[in-house]
Regions:
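Active-site and ligand/interface coordination hotspots across diverse enzymes
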Residues: 1-99, 119-121, 164, 168, ...
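C-terminal capping/extension of enzyme domains
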Residues: 1-11, 15-22, 149-166, 185-261
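Beta-strand-turn-beta hairpins that frame and shape the catalytic cleft
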Residues: 40-44, 127-133, 219-229
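Short, solvent-exposed loop/turn segments at secondary-structure junctions
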Residues: 49-54, 139-143, 182-186, 233-237
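Surface-exposed cleft-lining segments at the edges of enzyme active sites
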Residues: 67-76, 139-158
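Short, contiguous, well-structured surface segments enriched in hydrophobic/aromatic residues
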Residues: 83-86, 91, 126-139, 143
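Short mixed-charge
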Residues: 93-129, 196-223
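Proline-aspartate-enriched helix->loop->beta-strand connector
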Residues: 165-183
Length: 261
């Protein structure tokens, strides 16, 4: 894996994305290729549902890669989704660096949006995990703030879409994939489930208005040297009890397999 190869593959797949989804399409993939190559001890990829565009993005393809890496340059984080992705990814990377899990309370300074109860890691040289990971959307076209799960699943069932997604995974070559888009079949396919060890972890999240039992599934494929975690979408945490248990569960799972990478 080298820079020239990653740039060429990303550019090639960008053209496939533009052909498959017309108009306002999100060109996603690796956040920052130089950073991705610099820190390849554990390569992390998040699978989300679909992008939500600002008015300036309508009508033409745009770089989703810039969108999520720019979140680290803003004052605080621009969205709950990217903030939570950053914190969990940072925790997984620290497992590899330190050889042990960083507890939620020992993370770098956490700040809050004004009027927002969701925690967000403040930006510093140490805490720029969005530069070091990849983020992919199941559907590359603009969606609503609340996705239609049936539409997302139907998108995955299109052969052309699945081909593009797996071409992206092939060149990104992640070791830890977090499927956070309600498409369980994607997690099974990525893990090549018949060749994988399979486990689950259940937790009851207690939100302000309801309790919800969330089952996190995870697969480890020794042949691919790949951990696939099927988890809740990070932006949903305000409904079911907050970030700490989500962070703890996902990072604990990753830490159990980190010695393989």
């Amino acid at each position: 894996m080298n820079k020239e190869f990653l740039i060429a593959e990303q550019n090639r797949i960008d053209e496939l994305i533009k052909k498959q989804w017309a108009g306002s399409v999100a060109l996603d993939g690796i956040g920052d290729i130089d950073s991705y190559l610099k820190y390849d001890d554990v390569r992390i990829c998040w699978f989300l549902k679909e992008p939500v565009l600002s008015y300036k993005d309508y009508g033409t393809p745009y770089s989703y890669r810039t969108r999520f890496t720019d979140a680290a340059d803003a004052k605080g984080w621009r969205s709950t989704t990217f903030g939570h992705i950053a914190i969990v990814s940072y925790g997984i990377m620290k497992c590899k660096i330190d050889g042990s899990m960083t507890e939620f309370g020992d993370l770098p300074k956490i700040s809050l949006y004004k009027g927002d109860s969701s925690p967000h890691m403040e930006d510093s040289e140490e805490t720029r995990p969005l530069d070091f990971i990849s983020v992919l959307n199941m559907k590359k076209q603009n969606g609503a703030s609340k996705s239609n799960n049936a539409e997302i699943i139907a998108e995955y069932n299109k052969k052309e879409v699945k081909d593009i997604l797996f071409q992206q995974i092939k060149y990104i070559n992640p070791q830890v994939i977090i499927v956070a888009n309600r498409v369980e079949k994607l997690a099974e396919d990525l893990a090549e489930v018949k060749l994988s060890n399979f486990e689950t972890k259940s937790r009851v999240y207690e939100g302000k208005k309801k309790k919800e039992t969330v089952v996190t599934k995870f697969y480890f494929n020794t042949e691919l040297n790949r951990l696939v975690i099927y988890a809740r979408h990070p932006s949903m945490l305000s409904l079911v009890g907050g970030l700490k248990p989500y962070y703890t569960d996902l990072v604990n799972i990753a830490n159990s397999f980190i010695h393989h990478f």
